[in-house]
Structure formats: structure tokens, C-alpha cells
């Protein structure tokens, strides 16, 4: 089993499915543990479990000064994936928790697109 700990700087621009729909624009730093099976020719399976601290560009956002834990995975075939799924728990500054399910698709080594879904 191959384990990789990665420090990741990222920006999240997403639609959040809460009681009401909305968007947030957060950035942060995190650490991710990944399991990767590389079969070559752009074919691989990836699972990940990571934590990050976030700051939102809108200081009134519930996601400002929050942390998150996400667990998910995807399978690349020919360098492309259509099946990324996962779930994140956001720990908000006021002590509350928000759960978000997500789905994504894209091309390995590049940005992708994703949508959040209600659970």
C-alpha cells in the first residue's frame, strides 16, 4: 500500500447544498493521505482522506475560519474520471458541523468540475 502525505494549497469555489442553496469562496492549506494504484497508461485508482483549515473571502460566510475533513475517491481510465465521489465535514467557528456530499469529473493532472449534492 502506497501512502503519500501531501500538503495542498487549494481554492474551493463550490455550490453548497444546505437547507438553502448558496456558494462559498474559500481557500486554505491542508494535509492529505492518499492511496494510489497506478496501472499505467493513465489508468489508476485513488482514495484520499484529508484535513484543511479554511478562510472565506466573505468574512460573514459560515465557512470563514472553519476546518474540514474530506474522504473520497476516483478511478482514472485513460487519464479521465467521471466517478469522483466523497463527503466532507466542515467544523464551523461557532462549533456547528456541516456535511457535504460531492461528485466530480475531469482529467488527471488538471482542474476538474464538481457538484455538491444533498444527502
Residue ranges of predicted features:
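Intrinsically disordered, low-complexity Ser/Thr- and Pro-rich stretches
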Residues: 1-2, 18
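Sec-dependent signal peptide recognition
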Residues: 2-10
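Hydrophobic h-region of N-terminal signal peptides that target proteins for export
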Residues: 10-18
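Beta-strand-enriched cores of mature, soluble protein domains
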Residues: 19-119
Amino acid at each position: 500500500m502506497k501512502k503519500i502525505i501531501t500538503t495542498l494549497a487549494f481554492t474551493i469555489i463550490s455550490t453548497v447544498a444546505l437547507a438553502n442553496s448558496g456558494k462559498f469562496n474559500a481557500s486554505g492549506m491542508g494535509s492529505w493521505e492518499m492511496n494510489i494504484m497506478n496501472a499505467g497508461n493513465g489508468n489508476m485508482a485513488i482514495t484520499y482522506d484529508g484535513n484543511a483549515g479554511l478562510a472565506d473571502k466573505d468574512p460573514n460566510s459560515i465557512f470563514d475560519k472553519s476546518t474540514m475533513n474530506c474522504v473520497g475517491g476516483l478511478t482514472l481510465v485513460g487519464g479521465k474520471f467521471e466517478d469522483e465521489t466523497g463527503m466532507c465535514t466542515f467544523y464551523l467557528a461557532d462549533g456547528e458541523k456541516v456535511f457535504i456530499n460531492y461528485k466530480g469529473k475531469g482529467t488527471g493532472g488538471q482542474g476538474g468540475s464538481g457538484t455538491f449534492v444533498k444527502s
